[in-house]
Regions:
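Serine-hydrolase catalytic machinery in alpha/beta-hydrolase-like enzymes
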Residues: 7-19, 23-102
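Short beta->alpha connector loops
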Residues: 31-35, 114, 136-140
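Short, well-ordered alpha-helices that flank and scaffold nucleotide-derived cofactor binding pockets
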Residues: 41-44, 124-125, 177, 181
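Active-site nucleophile loop of the alpha/beta-hydrolase fold
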Residues: 55-58, 132-140
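Residue in the alpha/beta-hydrolase core beta-strand immediately N-terminal to the catalytic nucleophile
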Residues: 108, 130-132
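Gly/Ala-rich beta-loop-alpha elbow adjacent to hydrolase catalytic centers
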Residues: 110-115, 119
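Hydrolases whose catalytic domains are alpha/beta-hydrolase-1, hotdog thioesterase
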Residues: 118-122, 142
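The feature captures the conserved acid-bearing segment of alpha/beta-hydrolase catalytic domains
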Residues: 137-209
């Protein structure tokens, strides 16, 4: 018989920038097998206007064998619903803590790969209006219409590389079409499964200019 026990757990997150001076807060959710400590470095050159917050998935593991490099993930197929719930609670708690201490002109969330699915689930239950999904499949357990907003100040973007090894050409086109039909601005760049700096800055410029 399977049993569960609810108890407290310490989660880890990394930040970059000065929240007292920044105009915008950018939550960045890493992909499968990445660590927040290194993922956040992809956003270091955005400038002083951004305070970057990189939460880390609750599961950490050795990427190969039983030693060496470590990565993290947001969930696996095992006890999936429990992990989703725990992650939602932890992200909500983190946002509440930051909101109680700082104020920003704009809040933005970016989810990369597996972190994109996590971001999609998270943004259905909170009020972050500016969303960037990057090289991810939309999670099948939530209604896509739940992220559609009629508010004028909402910005939603999706980006993917032409050489992304996790999407063949047909899958790229269908994924781009899926997000476009939801009202997302879509972006495609000439690279693999990665964050493209030029595309990122173009998206952020579009979000922050309004």
């Amino acid at each position: 018989m399977e049993n569960t026990l609810t108890c407290s757990k310490t989660f880890r997150y990394f930040t970059f920038g000065n929240p007292d001076d920044a105009k915008y807060i950018l939550y960045v959710l890493h992909g499968y097998g990445q660590l927040a400590e290194y993922f956040i470095r992809k956003f270091h050159d955005l400038g002083n206007n951004y305070f970057i917050v990189a939460p880390e998935g609750m599961h950490r593991f050795y990427l190969k064998g039983s030693n060496g490099r470590v990565g993290a993930s947001w969930m696996t197929k095992e006890a999936r619903e429990l992990d989703i719930s725990d992650t939602q609670n932890w992200l909500n708690h983190l946002k509440k803590e930051i909101d109680s201490n700082y104020s920003f002109q704009k809040e933005i969330v970016l989810g990369f790969s597996q972190g994109g699915a996590t971001a999609a689930r998270w943004t259905t239950i909170n009020s972050i209006p500016n969303q960037i999904y990057w090289a991810n499949v939309f999670p099948t357990d939530i209604d896509p219409k739940s992220i559609i907003s009629k508010e004028n100040n909402v910005n939603k973007h999706f980006a993917i590389g032409t050489q992304d090894e996790y999407f063949n050409s047909e899958e790229q086109l269908s994924t781009l079409s899926f997000y476009a039909n939801l009202g997302f601005k879509t972006h495609i760049f000439n690279d693999s499964h990665t964050i493209d700096n030029i595309t990122l800055k173009e998206i952020l410029t579009d979000i922050t200019k309004k």
